[in-house]
């Protein structure tokens, strides 16, 4: 097992140590072991989860929703995990629809500056 500290986990995921520590406090991540000095050690599965959580957060999924999913996954509660995944998939689908609607609206915007009242006599 590859085990590495918070600083390496953060570096590999491209986030700050502060983000990793925040996610630890929220229960989104858990160390797989601790050093004799009490520092958490993380494995490749933790890195994968961190990358998933960060991508989901950047896509607009709230940390509370992600924490519910992570708790269900950590508890090996298959029914709850499936329910949380279904909710996230619904959110993603709604977001895709909203972005598609926005794309249509963007296509209809004029590319030239509008001439307003200042051009009136």
UniProtKB/Swiss-Prot annotation:
Residues 6-25 bind DNA. GO terms for molecular function: DNA binding; DNA-binding transcription factor activity. It comes from the Bacteria. Residues 3-72 form the HTH merR-type domain. It holds the Pfam family MerR_1. PROSITE patterns: HTH_MERR_2 (PS50937). GO terms for biological process: negative regulation of DNA-templated transcription; response to mercury ion. InterPro entries: DNA-bd_dom_put_sf, MerD, MerR-type_HTH_dom, MerR_fam. Keywords: DNA-binding, Mercuric resistance, Plasmid, Transcription, Transcription regulation, Transposable element. SUPFAM superfamilies: Putative DNA-binding domain. This is HTH-type transcriptional regulator MerD. The lineage of its organism: Bacteria, Pseudomonadati, Pseudomonadota, Gammaproteobacteria, Pseudomonadales. The gene is merD.
């Amino acid at each position: 097992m590859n085990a590495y500290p918070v600083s390496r986990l953060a570096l590999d995921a491209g986030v700050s140590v502060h983000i990793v520590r925040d996610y630890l406090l929220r229960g989104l991540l858990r160390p797989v072991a601790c050093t004799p000095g009490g520092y958490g050690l993380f494995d490749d599965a933790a890195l994968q989860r961190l990358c998933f959580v960060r991508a989901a957060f950047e896509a607009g999924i709230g940390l509370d929703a992600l924490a519910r999913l992570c708790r269900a996954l950590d508890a090996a509660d298959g029914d709850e995990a499936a329910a949380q995944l279904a909710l996230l998939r619904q959110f993603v689908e709604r977001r895709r629809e909203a972005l598609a609607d926005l794309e249509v609206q963007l296509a209809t915007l004029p590319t030239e500056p509008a001439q307003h009242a200042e051009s009136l006599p």
